[in-house]
Design a protein with these regions (language model features):
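Accessory carbohydrate-recognition regions in carbohydrate-active enzymes
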Residues: 1-320, 324-368, 374-423, 431-457, ...
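Short, compositionally stereotyped local motifs that mark structural "simplifiers"
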Residues: 656-783, 787-789
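Exposed aromatic-hydrophobic patches
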Residues: 202-204, 708-713, 852-860
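Solvent-exposed serine/threonine-rich low-complexity stretches and specific carbohydrate-binding patches
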Residues: 835-845
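Beta-strand-rich extracellular modules
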Residues: 220, 723-727, 873-875
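Short proline/glycine-enriched turn/loop motifs at strand-loop junctions of beta-rich domains
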Residues: 125-127, 689-695, 798-801, 819
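Aromatic, loop-rich ligand-recognition surfaces of beta-strand-rich domains
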Residues: 773-837, 851-901
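Extracellular Ig-like/FN3 beta-sandwich strand-entry sites
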Residues: 212, 715-719, 865
Length: 901
């Protein structure tokens, strides 16, 4: 049950290795974050047993084809058909789950094959037994269908929307005894065929005390015929036989790594971790090879197994490197799946789920998986096609890639999470370069090697942190502990060491081994407190290291690169011993589809892949006396606590890094230093760079470039383009910055307090004449939570004014709602204010699309005023329909520009 409590988000039900079916109880139907797997150990009510579940994700989905046994009069209200249960009557082992439903005294036993879920219900009381099929369980039902074949067999179709926007599941449900339909909820066709977006049926029969009823549910992603064919996996009704076969599959699978250990807790932690790495990705094709592609069409099998559920932002780090050791064939199948998704969906997967691209998280980390496999000599897929697909992902123009290609980094002006995206794109580009090198593609190799050094463009040599840039300069104020929209689920501490492709270059940028060691020490020894946005994923803090989320996972191993392996071992063992427990809350963060557990498996073995794409394992000290790795080819290798040795068929800790050649090297872009993005009369600026010998060249408003000898002064709105020359014929990419001369000399006194994450450049940002876009994550909006907004604009002298406007943004999914109303007041002395007007909001708070609204008023005749007060009333507590209601969430006001004429 490790990970079923706390924030682990694992499920306890039955499945087989990499199986299509995950048959597990559901205790959460509210879409809550800690209920992403459908189950949480703190709960006391089971609502049903569904056949698909996600292991440790941070988004909710699945829960398909839910069945629930009850007794008495059937009811379709989950609160009525749900049943209390006790953990003392619950058992979960590999391939088997059982529980007693207290409400009607029913014993439930579950097991599976790859594509079939097998239920055994024991009704301990005589009477009317029901099996509820509720297709509205958890996800939004787009299209439901139930076809009655006979009293023992039905076909089911469930097309649903949640995280995956258009998911298809087909099922064949078989009962070992005939049932009658006793109740129906249906808003569509009725008869032998039931359809609709509200669909539930109750199947009923009389039972004797102690009577067993068996149910088989076969899944298919392609159609009813696929489900019929897949049902051949389980012939007959011998539940114990199927349970034993599932257990045998797990025995074989888990014996791929054998450890010698007497501590039962450590054994349970290790093998549960190994188990968690093997419950996904999931086979997503029928027994005859047919599968549903990313184009939503059904395709014939092509000689490999097609899979789904690729949490690549997480799993490229440790789970997929682990698979290269013990799942070489599946690794090739995963990659062949990637390539089919590229062919049928237009690009490689980012976070694929049930033939849907969710576009969750960042990077194009499928290239890491492919490069790692190629580096380690894994075959069974087309290297040339893999390279073409990888290059395609890197050359797209979305998600900040256009700016990244143009200027060598992503700015806040271009895209949110700009720092994280720049760093992860750079690593992925290095992976593509390694693929090009294997295929002797010299030009591609040099191009992507140069791109892989783009991390240098966001590294601040003064502070030693990866920092966001805005308008060509460093964004400020800057706090490396602050979690904000410039980083993906983290802060600068947790991203400033992510240069796995160029660790020697990173160490050099920090000032050498000693300074790099000091920086690592500072991270681990800092106060374990973050600032800015509350981020539920950032857990397991050691200083600012956060083991509960993936960006930190390689950091403890960086001491190895500066000759301090004892510090690596110390940190790794602390994490192993403190953040993994044999308890339901035994994971310090989300399991994340096996990544959290893969870190444990590899680290406890004394190895880790810091740089996937490089045929190299980094050592630490193993925690077990003996570790035997059994490979697919029948060979095995023995590792020991004292020494891993070079027995895994690839190099160990050689650090054979090759410094980029001049043709591959990158000259970092210069940084522009200016007081702000806007100015009243004139503004000066200067350039700076890590290399103090760099020369700078600039162009103002598309004039010829010229060398900068001294600082410049602007006195009108201007766009500056600039680059640096390192003196050896290597120039940087060209960066542009635009500075605006303000349309007036107004000043503003903001009475409210904005959230530091959403400062929009400070108070002057509200009267600078620059309007924000609907992508508020770029940082152009000021945010105020749990308070009204109030500010006074000083026009500097009494003027005739007749036009008043203030601009607000709504993104209700992010708790940003329009103010209920905006009031405008006038004054000549800043003491006595007269209400001019009140503008009511007319934007529906339930509207999903990001929306901008000007709360404007035009007076019928001019008003004499020097001071204009603007007051916007906060929406307040999030309403009951809102996803943040259960968190007692308070709405934000987002404002950008106040205009007075």
């Amino acid at each position: 049950m490790i990970g079923t409590g706390g924030h682990g988000h694992t499920y306890p039900g039955a499945t087989v290795p990499f199986g299509m079916v995950q048959l597990s109880p559901d205790t959460r139907i509210d879409g809550s974050w800690d209920g992403c797997s459908g189950y949480h150990h703190d709960d006391s009510v089971i609502y049903g047993f569904s056949h698909t579940h996600l292991n440790g994700t941070g988004c909710t989905d699945y829960g398909d084809i839910m069945l629930m046994p009850t007794m008495g009069e059937p009811n379709f209200d989950p609160k009525e058909y749900g049943s209390k249960f006790s953990h003392s009557n619950e058992k979960a082992t590999a391939g088997f789950y059982s529980v007693k439903l207290d409400k009607h005294n029913i014993d439930v036993n579950l097991t599976t094959s790859t594509r079939v879920g097998f239920h055994q219900y024991v009704f301990n009381n005589a009477g009317q037994a029901n099996i509820i099929l509720d297709l509205n369980h958890r996800d939004k039902l787009l299209e439901g269908e139930v076809r009655i074949i006979d009293q023992k067999r039905i076909w089911v179709k469930r097309r649903s929307e949640a995280w995956a926007k258009d998911q298809y599941v087909f099922a064949l449900i078989e009962f070992d005894k005939p049932f009658e339909i006793s109740k129906v909820k249906c808003n569509g066709e009725k008869g032998r065929r039931f359809t609709g977006t509200e669909l539930a049926l109750s199947f009923t029969r009389k039972v004797k005390k102690g009577e067993k009823i068996l149910v088989k549910v076969t899944l298919s992603p392609t159609g009813f015929e696929g489900a019929e064919n897949n049902s051949s996996e389980i012939k007959g009704w011998d539940f114990n036989k199927v349970k034993k076969e599932a257990e045998q599959l797990w025995d074989k699978q888990l014996s791929k790594i054998e450890i010698t250990e007497t501590d039962k807790d450590k054994l349970a932690i290790f093998y549960t971790a190994l188990y968690h790495t093997m419950v996904q990705p999931n086979i997503a094709q029928d027994i005859d090879g047919k599968y549903r592609g990313r184009d939503n069409k059904v395709h014939d099998g092509e000689g490999f197994d097609y899979y789904s559920v690729f949490s690549l932002w997480d799993t490229f780090r440790a789970a997929h490197p682990l698979y290269t050791l013990i799942e070489k064939k599946r690794t090739a199948d995963f990659i062949n799946t990637f390539l089919k998704q590229y062919e049928q969906g237009g690009r490689l997967p980012v976070w694929e789920l049930a033939s849907n691209e969710t576009d969750c998280m960042i990077g194009y980390h499928s290239v890491s998986v492919m490069a790692d496999a190629m580096a380690k000599g894994i075959t069974g897929f087309d290297y040339e096609k893999a390279f073409a697909a990888a290059k395609h992902s890197a050359m797209l123009d979305h998600l900040g890639l256009d700016a990244y290609k143009r200027q060598g980094f992503i700015s806040m002006d271009d895209e949110h999470e700009s720092v994280s995206k720049t760093l992860e794109y750079a690593y992925d580009d290095w992976c593509i370069a390694q693929m090009a090198q294997i295929l002797n593609k010299k030009e591609d190799y040099e191009y992507f090697m140069k791109r892989s050094q783009s991390w240098k463009n966001i590294f601040d040599w003064e502070t030693g942190f990866m920092r966001p840039k805005k308008n060509g300069g460093w964004d400020k104020p800057f706090d490396p502990r602050e979690i904000n929209n410039n980083y993906t689920e983290g802060n600068s501490w947790q991203y400033s060491f992510f240069v796995p492709q160029d660790i020697p270059g990173m160490i050099e940028a920090y000032g050498g081994n000693d300074k790099f060691e000091a920086k690592l020490d500072e991270m681990f020894n800092s106060e374990s407190k973050t600032t800015g946005r509350e981020q539920v994923d950032v857990t397991g803090l050691i200083g600012q290291y956060a083991h509960g989320n993936e960006p930190s996972h390689h950091m403890a191993y960086l001491y190895n690169y500066i000759g301090k392996p004892e510090k690596t071992t110390d940190k790794v063992h602390y994490i192993l011993n403190n953040f993994y427990k044999n308890t339901p809350d035994g994971l310090i963060g989300n399991e994340d589809c096996g990544q959290m557990s893969a870190w444990y498996v590899l680290s406890s073995m004394g190895i880790y892949s810091v740089t996937p794409g490089k045929a190299e394992w980094i050592e630490s000290k193993a925690t077990f006396d003996k570790i035997k790795v059994n490979f697919e080819n029948g060979e095995s290798e023995l590792l020991s606590k004292n020494s891993v040795k070079n027995r895994l068929g690839i190099s160990m800790t050689k650090y054979n890094w090759i410094k980029p050649k001049l043709s591959e090297s990158l000259t970092p872009v210069p940084v522009i230093y200016a007081e702000s993005k806007s100015f009243k009369n004139k503004m000066g600026f200067v350039f700076d760079s890590f290399n103090k010998d760099t020369e700078y060249f600039y162009s103002i408003n598309n004039k010829e470039f010229e060398k900068l000898d001294i600082g410049l002064v602007l006195n009108e709105t201007s766009t500056i383009k600039f680059y640096s020359d390192n003196g050896y014929g290597k120039v940087s990419d060209t960066v542009s910055a635009t500075f605006f001369k303000k349309p007036n000399n107004y000043t503003i006194d903001i009475k409210s307090t904005y959230n530091p994450q959403y400062h929009a450049g400070g108070k002057e940002g509200l009267i600078d004449g620059i309007n924000g876009s609907t992508n508020w994550r770029k940082g152009d909006w000021q945010g105020y939570q749990s308070q009204d907004f109030e500010a006074i604009v000083d026009l500097q002298n009494v003027k005739e004014v007749s036009s008043f406007s203030s601009t607000f943004l709504q993104d209700q999914r992010s708790w940003i709602l329009m103010p209920t109303k905006v009031e405008y007041y006038s004054s000549t002395d800043n003491i006595n204010f007269i209400l001019i007007t009140s503008v009511e909001n007319d934007v529906d708070p339930k509207k999903d699309e990001n929306t901008i609204k000007d709360f404007s008023f035009k007076a019928s005749k001019p008003i004499n005023a020097r001071y204009i007060k603007v007051k916007a009333y906060n929406f307040g507590r999030l309403p009951e329909w809102h996803i943040g209601y259960h968190d007692k969430g308070e709405a934000f006001i987002f404002i950008d520009e106040i205009t007075i004429k």
